[in-house]
Amino acid sequence: MKGILDSILRVGRMIFAPTKTVQYPEEKLPLAPRTRGRIVLTRDPDGQERCVACNLCAAACPVDCIDVVKAETPDGRWYPESFRINFARCIFCGYCEEACPTSAIQLTPDVELADYRRGFLQYEKEDLLISGEGKHPGYRYWDVAGKAIAGKAQDPVDPKDLCP
């Protein structure tokens, strides 16, 4: 009997409580600052693509939704000839962003990717490239890749020193 009265009181309180429903397209709830949404490819400050087609993003992707085809410029620099992401399979885990050595792949807070056809959720390189530098303005991979840091140079290790 006590359980029934408790239930009736709880329902009575909830009837007069304010609603928490949000009319979604017109009103949007605030997203967390680090929300992971749509993936974009960024550019260097000089306007070139940051992606070097190393395929680390595709290897890190747990659902295998990234496909990269590598090409090479006459001066020997790699670039993605095609870069495709299937957002129908993407789980927005962020592993591709973490694996990217050049900060070319970045996740934006844009989470509205719904579509009526699954084929429209496959984005090509042209759809993913943005004109800006993304989260890391001024960063250029080729300025820091392979350069020695002053004071960090060490002598080569003798393998015999590693033995007990």
From Swiss-Prot:
Positions annotated to bind [4Fe-4S] cluster 2: 61, 90, 93, 96
Cofactor comment text: Binds 2 [4Fe-4S] clusters per subunit.
Record keywords, A-Z: 4Fe-4S, Cell inner membrane, Cell membrane, Iron, Iron-sulfur, Membrane, Metal-binding, NAD, Quinone, Repeat, Translocase, Ubiquinone
BP-aspect Gene Ontology terms: aerobic respiration
Enzyme class: translocase
Subcellular location: Cell inner membrane
EC id: 7.1.1.-
GO molecular function: 4 iron, 4 sulfur cluster binding; iron ion binding; NADH:ubiquinone reductase (non-electrogenic) activity; quinone binding
Membrane topology annotation: Peripheral membrane protein
Domain (4Fe-4S ferredoxin-type) ranges: 39-71, 81-110
Gene3D superfamilies named among the record's database cross-references: 3.30.70.3270
GO cellular component terms, A-Z: plasma membrane
Keyword check for Iron-sulfur: yes
Hydrolase listed as a keyword: no
One Pfam match: Fer4_7
Main location: membrane
Record family assignment: Belongs to the complex I 23 kDa subunit family.
Quaternary structure and interacting proteins, as annotated: NDH-1 is composed of 14 different subunits. Subunits NuoA, H, J, K, L, M, N constitute the membrane sector of the complex.
PANTHER family documented for this protein: NADH DEHYDROGENASE [UBIQUINONE] IRON-SULFUR PROTEIN 8, MITOCHONDRIAL, NADH DEHYDROGENASE UBIQUINONE IRON-SULFUR PROTEIN 8, MITOCHONDRIAL
Record's protein name: NADH-quinone oxidoreductase subunit I 2
Gene this protein is translated from: nuoI2
